[in-house]
Every structure is written in structure tokens, then in C-alpha cells.
């Protein structure tokens, strides 16, 4: 079938599809393209170009051909969370402001498109099995948001130095914040860090709220108890500038 341009929003969400039908194959979608919440294993028949957001969350990508055959350019956000992806092979070369790939089986970010390594972009890969942030060029990029909660990251080295909005490193086996960002424009999420031994390396500037876990703080400050929350907050405030306060739960 000859592929065509479609100047509209494609909505195939939640239709129990196992594949993208041949009869809607198109070269370009000049709106958003949404195939989330199906049972799709291959992006065959997806458009090569998407002007809006490309949304393929909550499918079975990774059990088939992964992201291969998908769009080469997405001018909006690229969302591929909730799949079975073990690699980024086939991901679009050009991606707009945000790439979200939470809840997959990624062990590395090899293949990450260089287009996401530009200032003011957002990257989210929560709930994967990434072990380090080095080698991807993150440190030279001023991200808008940077999220990697619940991975296997042991060090913040190699990550971005400046994040203009929110930064989330919660639930990783880091021992300190050394090598992490020096400035976070909004919130810094650092809860459930069971291996944390020191607050060394905390960003010097946090524009929003610093979120920490009480269990982690009592391990670092063994002379305090849960009743000393205010003292703990005061102690931590001496280490960094926090715009909206410190939350310890």
C-alpha cells in the first residue's frame, strides 16, 4: 500500500492491537500518534515522521523488534514507557523536547540519540537497570529535567552538572552525591538511598524542595532520632541553598 501523509491525530489507544494495521500505514503524521495500551510487539507500519507526540507506552515492544521500524523523526515528545525494551536500537534519530522510557528492562543507554543531548531537553528512564551515567555526554548538557529513579546507579558521576527543573535519583545504590549536579532549578528527589553514607556533593543550589528519607538521615547522623527532624533540616540547610525547604519523611 502506498504510504500517505495524515494531517490529524492518530488515536489507537487501548484497542487490544497486536500490530499496527496495514490499512493505516502512513509516511507522516502531522499530529500526535498514539498507540499506547495495546499488545504491539513491532512498530512496523508506524510513520517515519511525527510532528506531534509519539506515544507507544504500555505495549510489548522488546519482545519483538523493539523500536525498529518506528519513526525516524518525532518533533514532539517520544514516550515508550511500560514496554519490555532491553535496548534503544531503532529509536528515532531526531526527538523533540522530551524522551520518556520508564519501566523497561534497559541495562544501558547505548543508542541514545544525540538530539536529546541538547540544552533544555528532558530525559526520564525511571525503573530500569541502568548501572552508571558515564559515557553518554550528559555532563555537558543543561537538561530541563533528568529522572532515573529506581535503577542500579552507584555514582552520580557522568550525569548533568546543571538541571533547570527537577532531578530524581531516588532508590539507587549511591553512597554520596559526589559528581552530581551543582545546581537544580526546582526539586531534588533523593529518597530511599539505602547505601547513602554521606551528603557530600549535594547541589549547592536547589531552587525548589530537597526530598530526603528519614532512615537515610539517621544512618548518616546516628546521634539524632526521628524527633530531631527540625535539627536535621537546620543542619542540612547549612550545606546547600534550598529555595522552598527540605522534606524528610
Where does each model-flagged region fall?
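N-terminal capping/linker segments that flank leucine-rich repeat
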Residues: 1-23, 216-249
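Concave beta-strand-loop units of leucine-rich repeat
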Residues: 12-16, 29-40, 49-62, 74-85, ...
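Canonical leucine-rich repeat
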Residues: 20, 43-46, 63-70, 88, ...
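Intrinsically disordered, low-complexity coil segments
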Residues: 64-68, 119-120, 142, 224-230
Amino acid at each position: 500500500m502506498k504510504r500517505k501523509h495524515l494531517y490529524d491525530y492518530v488515536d489507537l489507544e487501548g484497542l487490544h492491537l497486536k500490530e499496527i494495521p496495514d490499512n493505516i500505514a502512513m509516511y507522516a503524521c502531522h499530529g500526535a500518534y498514539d498507540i499506547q495500551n495495546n499488545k504491539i510487539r513491532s512498530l512496523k507500519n508506524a510513520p517515519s515522521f511525527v510532528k506531534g507526540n509519539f506515544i507507544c507506552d504500555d505495549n510489548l515492544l522488546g519482545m519483538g523488534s523493539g523500536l525498529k521500524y518506528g519513526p525516524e523523526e518525532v518533533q514532539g515528545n517520544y514516550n515508550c514507557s511500560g514496554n519490555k525494551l532491553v535496548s534503544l536500537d531503532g529509536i528515532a534519530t531526531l526527538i523533540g523536547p522530551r524522551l520518556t522510557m520508564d519501566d523497561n528492562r534497559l541495562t544501558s543507554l547505548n543508542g541514545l540519540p544525540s538530539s536529546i543531548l541538547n540544552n533544555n531537553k528532558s530525559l526520564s528512564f525511571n525503573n530500569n537497570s541502568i548501572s552508571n551515567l558515564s559515557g553518554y555526554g550528559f555532563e555537558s548538557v543543561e537538561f530541563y529535567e533528568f529522572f532515573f529513579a529506581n535503577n542500579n546507579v552507584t555514582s552520580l558521576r557522568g550525569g548533568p552538572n546543571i538541571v533547570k527543573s527537577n532531578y530524581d535519583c531516588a532508590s539507587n545504590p549511591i553512597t554520596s552525591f559526589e559528581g552530581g549536579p551543582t545546581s537544580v532549578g526546582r526539586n531534588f528527589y533523593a529518597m530511599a538511598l539505602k547505601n547513602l553514607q554521606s551528603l557530600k556533593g549535594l547541589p549547592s543550589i536547589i531552587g525548589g524542595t530537597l526530598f530526603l528519607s528519614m532512615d537515610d538521615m539517621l544512618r548518616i547522623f546516628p546521634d539524632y532520632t526521628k524527633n530531631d527532624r527540625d535539627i536535621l533540616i537546620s543542619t542540612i540547610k547549612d550545606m546547600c541553598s534550598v529555595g522552598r525547604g527540605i522534606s524528610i519523611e
